[in-house]
């Protein structure tokens, strides 16, 4: 037993020994692998740290190598772009030639073209995407939805925040890429280097000039500087400042100035002579008018305005200096668009006197006007649909300051963006003390049943603006008796996806990046259309059929009468106080067209009701109201008589203009008389001098002859007429 026990114990100890050895071996292996893993991890961390610092300047690398290593990265990081601008700026002008020779500038210009957000970048959209858009926007698909009510599926997902964020990232990249280019051309910041002499820019060789001139830089400048929306510019100050700095950097190089002066395509405009002067004028005029509202803490905008003035003047002066070297026939003839001031209206009326030109010149100063909506003790003194909402808001509350500034920016922008022509126009009236209270007047477009009519709206910006849409109400309803459109109810409600009053696709709904201008254009373009009958969802099934066309024609006949009666006649008889001048002048300028329109309606109704079929009125529309041909025709005849008896609202202005012209003519004639009298006096004095000269000459000659006679011999000289004779 003892031997067996000893054998078992020895075998157990042997097993235990082997187990311990195996454990030690595993432990050693784990330690070895652990050390190997740790060392590899440390090396990876070190390499990653080196990479994270890259492309931190390596002392052994030149500036060219540093810049090349950065701009060749995929994707290009913002932090590295900032370093590149510093590297390029620190290099001397003579050393910058290497950037051109090594292809750095060529690659940089390609990156700028790829990053630019503009119309020409949209043209590179894939063919498949274009087909998808065409299918989505085709008339066939839209005709089955009801205009203005939204199209497509309401379940579609569209992340507006992500879209805007991506755009801002690209815009920031473009801003700094342009800054790198400016660092190369002139130096950065550009405003500190404007006094650099052209002969110092030795790196701007013919190759560098050709690279920049042939790149997308000119098209980017031309596209973005066309923008006259103050709201858009104020929201993207950095990119516009970079664009102006790029133009100034190019203007510092004499070889690039011609490309700023001459339009780069037949459809483009001169950057230096048209776009930049207009951009500067818009910014300065808006800042002067709205500075008190935009103000207070907005030093950023004030600084931007100062830079706009400095950089614009630099470019304009460079363009003028260049054109002084050209013969007059080779200089670029441009006509910079200018909004007229609020004085001297008729002095602006130069050029052809067609109806379109006359309408614009007469109505332009009335398009954006102010009025007093708030009376004593902060009470509204005009009719207003959203009176209760306006009363419950303290416009001077600190938490509404951003809302007020946003509204002011939008109003400043629409001054240059509102449509104005004889066919269709938009007029806006607001109170300078309460910019959240707005009244709008929209004229009906030609070739629609709303032609020449004037339709009034009340608009209010709620406290949640711009995160919630503005509130809009339609006022031209004939005291609730007429519904002008399936989208416009006789109680003033407006059905549009952008206003949140109807379901629509996410991209058709309101978002914080929408604006008042989009709402106004949507109302004008989506509601006041040629065939409003098909705006009603469900009626689209008749579109393209004989029955549908007949329904639409008869519906339009009723809308035309409502327009003539309520949007023209009632406006003429009882104009809104704040739009009275607009209404009177609009109707006077369009009276001939309205008379033809009224007579055409009478003829169409007479033709229709001469038909027995039509007189039975088998087809009745649910949304037709007050159909009475005899009464309606009588109303239109009254309108014709009232228009024919209408007195010109321009009579006072025309009398003043006539008086001014007479005064100018009288002053001109008086000036001519004075000039003629002065010339006559000069001629008289001239004749007197000539006679005096002749008398003196005769006297001298006579004296000389007398001397000769008394002295028979001797040599005598003839004295000068102007000199006194010694003998005399």
Curated annotation (Swiss-Prot):
Compositionally biased residues, Basic and acidic residues: 658-678
SUPFAM superfamilies documented for this protein: UBC-like
Gene3D superfamilies: Ubiquitin Conjugating Enzyme
One Gene Ontology biological process: negative regulation of apoptotic process
Composition-biased stretches (Low complexity): 1-17
Biased composition (Polar residues): 710-728
Catalytic residues identified in the record: 495
Family matches, as Pfam families: UQ_con (PF00179)
Region Disordered: start-end pairs: 1-23, 123-155, 649-678, 709-728
Domain UBC core: from-to ranges: 402-568
PROSITE patterns according to UniProt: UBC_2
Entry keyword set: Ligase, Transferase, Ubl conjugation pathway
Example of a GO cellular component annotation carried by this entry: nucleus
GO molecular function: ligase activity; ubiquitin conjugating enzyme activity
Protein family according to the UniProt entry: Belongs to the ubiquitin-conjugating enzyme family.
Name of protein: Probable ubiquitin-conjugating enzyme protein 17
Species per Swiss-Prot/TrEMBL record: Caenorhabditis elegans
